[in-house]
Amino acid sequence: MKAAVIYQKGELPEYVDFPEPVAQNDDELLVSVKAVAIKHFDKGKAAGRHYSSSIPRENGQVIGGDGVCVLDDGTKVYGMGVSGMLAEKATIEKDRVVKLPANLSDATAAALANAVIGSAMGLRFKADIQPGDVVLINGATGFTGRVAVQIAKHYGAKKVIATGRNTQSLQDLLALGADEIISLNQGDEQFLDQLKKSQLNGPVGVIIDYLWGHSAEMILGSSKGKGSFTNKIRFVSVGSVTGDLIQLSAANLRSVNLQLTGSGLGSWSNDQVRLLFSEILPEMFQLASDGKLKVETIEVNLKNIADIWNLDVSDGQRLVVTI
């Protein structure tokens, strides 16, 4: 079979002939792959930068962890790979499969899944979002951030405040459900002043953060209390695009009802992952099929994997490899 394979961490994937995988037990299924999204996670893992990275096997390793595929009976599903997914054939986990709506495109389904995982899991299980919450999404102009804005609204957020640097992408977020946008290109004082004004009619209760770094420091610092009663703030770290470390005053933890947590591989319970596949993903795929959850994709062919691996994709779009 043809596949995208890496032989050394950090090298470009190669389009080569590779042995077809074999299901090792009854919990695995051999499938034909149709579409796989290329995410920051995939690039980081292939380069050895992600905490879940492993050293490629000596004879090469197929990359890609999830995607749209077809079962033996012709059913089209989203699945999580046991073997790498950027190949004509792959093995997937039998209990981590979601049947796809008939009119949902392969590219949309492939692109949407990881963004749902990177937004809905944090909103639902880490932030415990409730109808009427005011939600701040820090770094909302990226692909997952755009999905997070829409899902927060779907879950009943009264107001969604979105931050980001790309001016056009920030404007686009208003059409996707954001009620207010705040640019990260302005000075610190201006940013903090706008953040304060955005909460005059109700304080932020949920913060989904894709950036970490200085903007997270400012947001957390602005929440510091003065000894009076405060509303509960659930701050959920999902990404660290602008830095892996921050400075946080201990007073932030003592002076405000702050719940500081993260959402990612290793932070969810087995029950939460089961709900992801049995409830959350099916619901979100259906919303996308109905035109109520919107994403933008760029489709490329597997044979061009080396040429497009480092392609500069615009904010809010996802690269999808079709097979």
Predicted regions mapped to residue ranges:
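Glycine-rich beta-strand-centered segment in the early N-terminal region that forms part
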Residues: 21-42, 47-85
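Rossmann-fold dehydrogenase core element
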Residues: 228-239, 247-292
